[in-house]
């Protein structure tokens, strides 16, 4: 940063007093202080954001390393399992001498795990709404269709009995 001693600050203050004047100097000093504070906060925010980005990049690298290590472990396990199954099948074929069992042994050695299924549609709003059981939706009062206020009042108003309505006439 800039080296400002007391003598330099006094010189700057004297020049500012002469140039700006004693009436406007406090207002200008407050404005300058506010601008310097904003600049310092902006610099601190930029530093924090840069450090966060660096940490995120390191985490991404670590994640890819872990995923690669997991894939390697899965492949080695699969290779060992297939090697052992082929050995077992060979010994079984030697013991039984059945040609049909030899075909199943080769098919077992060629077995590969199914690829992971994509989760298409799981994040859609409609699927989330329809995932709840109907009895739970009814009990909790989850509305599936829009209904106007008048229709809702009519739906929840108790029915008028015919005997009560005859006694209350406008003309009586």
From Swiss-Prot:
GO terms for biological process: protein transport by the Tat complex. GO terms for cellular component: TAT protein transport complex. Keywords: Cell inner membrane, Cell membrane, Membrane, Protein transport, Translocation, Transmembrane, Transmembrane helix, Transport. GO terms for molecular function: protein transmembrane transporter activity. Residues 97-129 are annotated as: Disordered. The chain crosses the membrane at residues 1-21. It is found in: Cell inner membrane. InterPro entries: TatA/B/E (IPR003369), TatB (IPR018448). It is a single-pass membrane protein. Pfam families: TatA_B_E. PANTHER family: SEC-INDEPENDENT PROTEIN TRANSLOCASE PROTEIN TATA, CHLOROPLASTIC. Part of the twin-arginine translocation (Tat) system that transports large folded proteins containing a characteristic twin-arginine motif in their signal peptide across membranes. Together with TatC, TatB is part of a receptor directly interacting with Tat signal peptides. TatB may form an oligomeric binding site that transiently accommodates folded Tat precursor proteins before their translocation. The Tat system comprises two distinct complexes: a TatABC complex, containing multiple copies of TatA, TatB and TatC subunits, and a separate TatA complex, containing only TatA subunits. Substrates initially bind to the TatABC complex, which probably triggers association of the separate TatA complex to form the active translocon. Belongs to the TatB family. This is Sec-independent protein translocase protein TatB. The gene is tatB.
